[in-house]
Regions:
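Aliphatic-rich helix starts adjacent to a transmembrane/signal segment
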Residues: 2-53
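Flexible, low-complexity segments enriched in proline/glycine/serine and punctuated by aromatic residues
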Residues: 53-200
Length: 200
């Protein structure tokens, strides 16, 4: 009588393979969840870059309405490209345009009003509960603060409490300066800010 050796996969080897595969699939599911979590922030920041470029082009086209230039002396002319209302007030704004400067001739002042209304509508459409603040002029530079609501902006605890973005101050530099919200914005919990500056 000869003894035959068993060939093939045993049940135990099969179970080990299934366990290893299950752990791998759980890892992939976790990676997918993390990717989805950061998607809103990434998309909003990417949209913000395009929005700032759009605004800078609008201001360059209508530079006379953006305040004094380097060459001007004498009386200060305030920039018409400013937005000072806080985030909560902006959520209630309706952006009705009285004169469409794309189809009718407009003065520099009317063009600035039209530009801001249409640009603010783009901000709201591109970002969840989007808002913006603008300050400065073409001589000193324009500072743009984009604000949006991010339900994932939490403290990391198990109850996922929304946190408030840091308030801007003079001591901040680098990323802290670029992601803080101005005090005037009165940003609610869960609102993120992204700040940009440019000279038209």
């Amino acid at each position: 009588m000869t003894r035959r050796t068993h060939k093939g996969v045993t049940l135990i080897e099969m179970m080990v393979a299934l366990i290893i595969m299950s752990i791998g699939l759980l890892g992939l599911a976790g990676l997918q969840a993390a990717t989805t979590k950061y998607r809103i922030t990434t998309m909003s920041r990417a949209a913000g870059t395009g929005l700032v470029f759009d605004l800078s082009e609008r201001i360059r086209i209508n530079a006379d309405a953006a305040g004094p230039s380097f060459m001007q002396s004498g009386s200060e002319v305030a920039s018409l490209y400013t937005i000072a209302s806080d985030w909560t007030a902006q959520q209630k704004d309706s952006f009705s345009v009285s004169k469409n400067c794309n189809t009718a001739a407009c003065t520099s002042s009317e063009r600035a009003t039209f530009d801001l209304l249409t640009w603010r509508q783009k901000v709201r459409d591109s970002m969840p509960q989007g808002g913006a603040m603008l300050s400065g002029n073409k001589r000193d530079g324009i500072t743009v603060t984009l604000m949006w609501f991010d339900k994932e902006f939490t403290d990391g605890s198990s109850d996922a409490t929304l946190v408030k973005a840091p308030t801007c101050n003079d001591q901040q530099t680098g990323m802290a300066q670029q992601t803080c919200c101005p005090a005037e914005a009165k940003a609610a919990e869960g609102v993120r800010c992204s700040r940009f500056s440019f000279v038209p």
